[in-house]
Each structure stands twice: as structure tokens, then as C-alpha cells.
A protein has these predicted regions:
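DNA-contacting surface of Y-family translesion DNA polymerases
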Residues: 8, 181, 189-334, 339-372
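Gly/Gly-Pro- and Ser/Thr-rich, intrinsically disordered tail segments characteristic of DNA damage-repair
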Residues: 1-215, 220-221, 345-347, 354-373
Length: 373
């Protein structure tokens, strides 16, 4: 059997790099892309900012504490998406087996490539050069025989790096790999692993599959395989959409019923717009509420008919909100709504239609915390 050749391309600090490219005054300075308000969150931080401990998903307030001279630049998502599409077209020069997993990264299966290039590392070098010439941006590339190791490799020599993990070196590489660098290991999983005495791939390899399944559920089987360099997942050219949603963080915490209802209504309208744009139809509505102390809850309700109209979604959203306890001492910071639970046929049709126009970017759902309950 021919060994697969998988490349993972990951743009370096993509949003921040675009802003530094377009504005020479930002080059070499700590930059964060995000909303510069009391509730703002960092979307991407430049490498200069990361040296201070600034990172994505961090509050702007905390980021400024760590880096007082941090420059905040508003996010231009539509603009970044156009550049991402330009990069995707470069990928298509080499293979049609492309799996975008977010706006700034993708897997490519180049086992059989359009240019007949034998070595995957040569393809990766060409792609990096083409991206630099076309956009002025740098990318890091990871190469291996499976997706797990290709992604790990792309992080290994960032920024503007390239790393290959060969099959005969994989087990030794994994043995030394900290478990926090394993795909799918989040904070809760990491805490459990450390409690079990698992700190790297070698430690993980010593644990039986039965015990991993007992502790981590379905994810245990994946961790068992990853520790042995096994990952047979194919590069998927389109990803079945599982949900459509939106959320908003408020400038100030809210607790008055009228204010909460108004914000819920606005969120419903935003959700309806996204449903209309995506063409997705689901049967389950989920409400997400995050409180001022950053604790959060979700409530869901399902029905037989698909949800796509305001008079269908708004009453259900209000019913879900009634299940949430909030008050002046437990105010709300964020409200989110999503629709899920489509038939596979509907979801597949939506993705096929979308893929004709442009690649569908969706974060890989490889954080297994939901399986830990």
C-alpha cells in the first residue's frame, strides 16, 4: 500500500500578518486583531505580541495588561476571506483533495498530485513560495503520512517553517510529544491526563485502550491510536455542516428582563440572516448563555419541522430563556443561538452548493470536552 502524503498548511498569525502587510507602520510592533472595547476579545495576535503572552480568545483588557503598547486593529473578516480564497486557488494547482479546516489552514493530500512531483516536501516548498509571491504572507507547512502528524509538524517550526515527520521516525517523535500538543487535548482532558501520570506520548502509549475508553469515552480510542501514530482519516473535500449559529457579547452585563428579551430578539434576527445565507435547515435550537463570571450553560429544544422562520424560532428561544436563572448578582455577558440537527441529505446538499462558490471553512471539532461528562 502506498504511504499517503499529507500536507498541513497553516498561515502565520494570519489576520495580524495581513494588517502588518497593509500598514507598514504596524510592522515589527505588537498587534492584535479584535474589537477594542471593554468586552473585546483578541482574534489573532502578531508574533511580536505573543512574546508578551498575548493570544487568541484572550480579553483585550488582559492582553493590554500583558502588553501595554499593544496596538488593536479592527477585524476585517470579509477581506481576510478573499485572501484565503486566493490561497485556496494556489492549493488547487497541486491537488483537488483539499480540506479547509479554518480560514487560515487546510490539509492537502498530495499522494497523487497534478504536477507529478514525487516529494511532498518539494510541493510544500513550492506552495509556501507561491503564497509569499501572491500575497506577501508567510505560511508554515507540516508533512507526514497522516493528518494528526502533519498538523503537529506545521506547528513545530513556526513561523515560516517546514517540517516533515517520516513514518520511520513517527513513534520516536510521538513518544517525546507533550500531551497538550496532541490534537483534541483541551484543558479538562489535560488535567485528567496529568492526574493519571500521562505527560507525553510515551506515557500515553503505556495506558490500555480499555482504560482510556473508561476515562475519556470515545476520545480514548483516538488517543490510543494517535499515541501509536495511527490516523486513517481521509482528507475530506467538503465537511458536512452540522449547525448554523451566532452569538454576541454585550458591552455591559445585562439582567433586566426587558433588556435580555431585546438582545435575544436581535440574536434571533442575526440567526435568521445566517440561516438564509447558508441554506442550512435544522430541527434543534440551542441557546447559549455566558454569565459575568464566565460560567455558561446551554439549553436545547427539538421539533419535527425545520426551523427557518422568525415565528418558529423566537417562541422557542423565549421558552429556552425561561429555563435560565439570571439576576443582578448573576448577570448575562453573552447570548448565542444555533440551529442544528439537519438530515444528512439536507446538510450534504448545502455543502455541495457552497463548495461550488468557495471553500466552506469550519473549525475542526477535535476538542473532546463534550465527551467527558
Amino acid at each position: 500500500m502506498t504511504e499517503r502524503k499529507i500536507i498541513h498548511i497553516d498561515m502565520d498569525a494570519f489576520f495580524a500578518a495581513v494588517e502588518q502587510r497593509d500598514n507598514p507602520e504596524l510592522r515589527g510592533k505588537p498587534v492584535a486583531v479584535g474589537f477594542d472595547g471593554p468586552r473585546g476579545v483578541v482574534s489573532t495576535a502578531s508574533y511580536e505580541a505573543r512574546k508578551y503572552g498575548v493570544h487568541s480568545a484572550q480579553s483585550i483588557a488582559q492582553a493590554k495588561q500583558r502588553c501595554p503598547n499593544l496596538i488593536i486593529v479592527p477585524c476585517r473578516h470579509d477581506y481576510y476571506a478573499k485572501i484565503s480564497h486566493q490561497i485556496h486557488q494556489i492549493f488547487q494547482e497541486y491537488t483537488d483533495l483539499i480540506e479547509p479546516i479554518s480560514i487560515d489552514e487546510a490539509f492537502l493530500d498530495v499522494t497523487q498530485n497534478k504536477k507529478g512531483i514525487e516529494l511532498a516536501v518539494d510541493i510544500a516548498k513550492e506552495i509556501k513560495t507561491r503564497i509569499k509571491e501572491a500575497t506577501g504572507l508567510t505560511a508554515s507547512a507540516g508533512i507526514s503520512y497522516c493528518k494528526f502528524l502533519a498538523k503537529v509538524a506545521s506547528d513545530y517550526r513556526k513561523p515560516d517553517g517546514i517540517c516533515t515527520i517520516h513514518p520511520d521516525k513517527a513513534l520516536d517523535f510521538i513518544a517525546q510529544l507533550p500531551v497538550e500538543d496532541f490534537w483534541g487535548v483541551g484543558k479538562k482532558t489535560l488535567q485528567k491526563m496529568h492526574f493519571m501520570g500521562i505527560f507525553n506520548g510515551a506515557d500515553l502509549r503505556k495506558v490500555s485502550e480499555e482504560h482510556l475508553l473508561e476515562v475519556f469515552g470515545k476520545a480514548g480510542h483516538i488517543f490510543y491510536d494517535f499515541a501509536r501514530g495511527i490516523d486513517e482519516r481521509p482528507v475530506i473535500t467538503y465537511r458536512e455542516r452540522k449547525s448554523v449559529g451566532c452569538e454576541q457579547t454585550f458591552l455591559e452585563d445585562i439582567y433586566l428582563k426587558t433588556a435580555v428579551i431585546i438582545e435575544l430578539y436581535r440574536t434571533v434576527l442575526e440567526l435568521l440572516e445566517r440561516i438564509a445565507k447558508s441554506g442550512f435547515e435544522g430541527r434543534t435550537l440551542t441557546l447559549k448563555v455566558k454569565f459575568a463570571d464566565f460560567t455558561q450553560i446551554t439549553r436545547s429544544i427539538s421539533q419535527e419541522k425545520v426551523l427557518k422562520k422568525k415565528d418558529e424560532i423566537l417562541p422557542l428561544a423565549k421558552r429556552l430563556l425561561q429555563q435560565v436563572d439570571y439576576s443582578s448578582i448573576h448577570p448575562i455577558r453573552l447570548i448565542g443561538l444555533s440551529v442544528s440537527n439537519a438530515t444528512s441529505e439536507e446538510a450534504r446538499m448545502v455543502d455541495k452548493e457552497n463548495s461550488i462558490q468557495k471553500p466552506e471553512y469550519k473549525e475542526l471539532e477535535l476538542e473532546f470536552e463534550d465527551w467527558e461528562t
